[in-house]
From Swiss-Prot:
It comes from the Bacteria. It is found in: Cytoplasm. Associates with the EF-Tu.GDP complex and induces the exchange of GDP to GTP. It remains bound to the aminoacyl-tRNA.EF-Tu.GTP complex up to the GTP hydrolysis stage on the ribosome. Pfam families: EF_TS. This is Elongation factor Ts. Residues 76-79 are annotated as: Involved in Mg(2+) ion dislocation from EF-Tu. It comes from Mycolicibacterium gilvum (strain PYR-GCK) (Mycobacterium gilvum (strain PYR-GCK)).
Length: 271
């Protein structure tokens, strides 16, 4: 005779998100001890999460709050649309802001209610049956502007931008956030670009020009022109503004009296 009731099964399912048979089996194994059954399902969930570790997490969302920006990944857009997944993401980004967590490790260790962010993600992963990954996190402690972009109306934001700046023109800072979202700047200034990357661009530009049969005396000018083009692609302040392509982002910021001190751009599934 079973030493548990249908109400026990229902309660266990509601608490853990486990299926009916898994809940029944846990209660049988626990000999009706409800707390032990919960523990058994947690252990089973942890094992399942481990098995999921090799599966890809190419979906998910970005979230921002009070200077914090996070990317939380799932395996499918079905989970990304899930209200509980989105609610947990909002709790995590709030925890990131409260803890001033500047990286994933710091955020995983941050408190969230009676547990940690890391355990909260593991519990949700076990409940919904997908691998979840806190992929990126950062926090800026200055004056910030944020922008979140949706790829589709029925999906949560997939691109998030955080801009730290000085100055009073919030609209200019917002325009820069839109710029970063659209044109994917990687660096703030030319000085931020690693020297080996610039050297490689110069080498490629020179070899390409030679292969095209350009005259030797023109190579220096051609190479410099192509490196300048590279800077305009990857350096925020060098980029033509999306609002006025006759001016650089730096020129428009100077006019607005705004200085960008740093920025971050997260896009779901992208490096």
């Amino acid at each position: 005779m079973a030493n548990y009731t249908a109400a026990d099964v229902k309660r266990l399912r509601e608490l853990t998100g486990a299926g009916m048979m898994d809940s029944k089996n846990a209660l049988v194994e626990a000999e009706g001890d409800f707390d032990k059954a919960v523990e058994l399902l947690r252990i089973k969930g942890a094992k399942d999460v481990g098995k999921r570790a090799e599966r890809a997490t190419a979906e998910g969302l970005v979230a921002a709050k009070d200077g914090a920006l996070i990317e939380l990944n799932s395996e499918t857009d079905f989970v990304a649309k899930n209200a509980e997944f989105q609610a947990v993401a909002e709790q995590i980004v709030a925890a990131a802001a409260a803890a001033k967590a500047t990286d994933v490790d710091a955020l995983k260790a941050a408190k969230l209610g009676d547990t940690t962010v890391e355990q909260t993600i593991a519990d949700l992963s076990a409940k919904i049956g997908e691998k979840l990954e806190l992929r990126r996190a950062t926090y800026f402690d200055g004056q910030v502007e944020t922008y979140l972009h949706k790829r589709a109306a029925d999906l949560p934001p997939a691109v998030g931008v955080l801009v730290e700046y000085t100055g009073d023109d919030k609209s200019a800072a917002h325009a820069v956030a839109l710029q970063i979202a659209a044109l994917k700047a990687k660096y703030l200034t030319r000085e931020d670009v690693p020297e080996d990357i610039v050297a490689n661009e110069r080498r490629i530009a020179e070899e390409t020009a030679r292969a095209e049969g350009k005259p030797e005396q023109a190579l220096t000018k051609i190479v410099e022109g192509r490196v300048t083009g590279f800077y305009k692609d990857v350096v925020l302040l060098d980029q033509p503004s999306v609002s006025d392509n006759k001016k650089s982002v730096k020129a428009l910021l100077d006019e607005a009296g705004v200085t960008v001190t740093r920025f971050a751009r997260f896009e779901v599934g992208q490096a």
